Curated annotation (Swiss-Prot):
Pfam families noted in UniProt: Ribosomal_L6
Keywords for this protein: Ribonucleoprotein, Ribosomal protein, RNA-binding, rRNA-binding
The gene coding this protein: rplF
Ribosomal protein in keyword set: yes
Protein's UniProt keywords contain Ribonucleoprotein: yes
Protein name per UniProt: Large ribosomal subunit protein uL6
Amino acid sequence: MSRVGKKLLEIPSDVTVTLNDNNTVAVKGPKGELTRTFHPDMEIKVEDNVLTVARPSDQKEHRALHGTTRSLLGNMVEGVSKGFERGLELVGVGYRASKSGNKLVLNVGYSHPVEIVPEEGIEIEVPSQTKVVVKGTDKERVGAIAANIRAVRSPEPYKGKGIRYEGEVVRRKEGKSAK
């Protein structure tokens, strides 16, 4: 039995979960609404504000899907009730971030500023010139946008310059040693 899959998922009072016939789950809460279609073999039930996921057999595919489905549902419920955020730091001389409308503008050592437009449901905040915070209800989308921002100038191992996640430790290398 999947340790994650057999955990019961308690639904907060301000969140509503609706199940459709083709295993589509819609979760609505104070921060927004998320919808996702799950594998038809997974049995998803809602009883007394508790969400359960069951699998039909112990086949390898069903065992894998069991925990994954439970985790995705848990992230949906957490996303619409609390939301997710991912912090990024800009490290380097002259590296700075700013907002222009809803676009994020990054000056990270290129000859031109890099503009990133967030997709719908994703909010980008710039609390300071060297900090960027990506917020949203969908954990997958928040992580993907944060990864796209980091990929603009990922941290290099010699000086550590670049865009890194908050709390990320960059593995440093020693430069060439002189003879």
